[in-house]
């Protein structure tokens, strides 16, 4: 019998771009290797436990928006139970802008 794992946490879409250096206010840099993908510590754990064969439940809140659709598509594809996932029009789904420099250092907004 598969274990039941319930994860309470967040979902956010990560928008990642590489630049030679971290920009300062007012500066424009050319970036490369843009990527967009699902994330959030709780969400990542729920997906990982489902991939390992657990009955995985995710408890969280997402917006009724395009980024929220990324979450629900992900959970359906990965077999994460969303019985306790709630959606709202009162806030947007989380997003993080991740900037990586040539040294591998990053910051997230």
What are these regions (language model features)?
Residues 1-61, 66-70, 76-77:
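Glycine-rich phosphate/adenosyl-contacting loop at the front of the ribokinase-like
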Residues 15, 94, 106-108:
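Short, well-ordered, mixed-charge alpha-helical segments that flank or form enzyme active sites
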Residues 55, 81, 105:
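Residue-level detector of anion-binding/catalytic polar loops
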Residues 69-72, 95-98:
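Short secondary-structure transition/capping segments
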Residues 74-91:
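A glycine-rich helix N-cap at a beta->alpha junction
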Residues 87-88, 98-109:
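Conserved phosphate-binding/catalytic loop of the ribokinase/pfkB sugar-kinase fold
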């Amino acid at each position: 019998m598969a274990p039941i794992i319930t994860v309470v946490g967040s979902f956010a879409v990560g928008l990642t771009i590489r630049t030679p250096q971290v920009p300062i206010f007012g500066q424009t840099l050319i970036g490369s290797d843009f990527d967009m993908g699902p994330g959030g510590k709780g969400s990542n754990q729920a997906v990982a436990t489902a991939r390992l064969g657990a009955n995985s439940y995710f408890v969280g809140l997402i917006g009724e928006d395009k980024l929220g659709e990324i979450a629900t598509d992900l959970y359906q594809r990965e077999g994460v139970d969303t019985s306790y996932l709630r959606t709202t029009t009162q806030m947007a789904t989380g997003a993080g802008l991740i900037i990586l420099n040539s040294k591998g250092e990053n910051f997230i907004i």
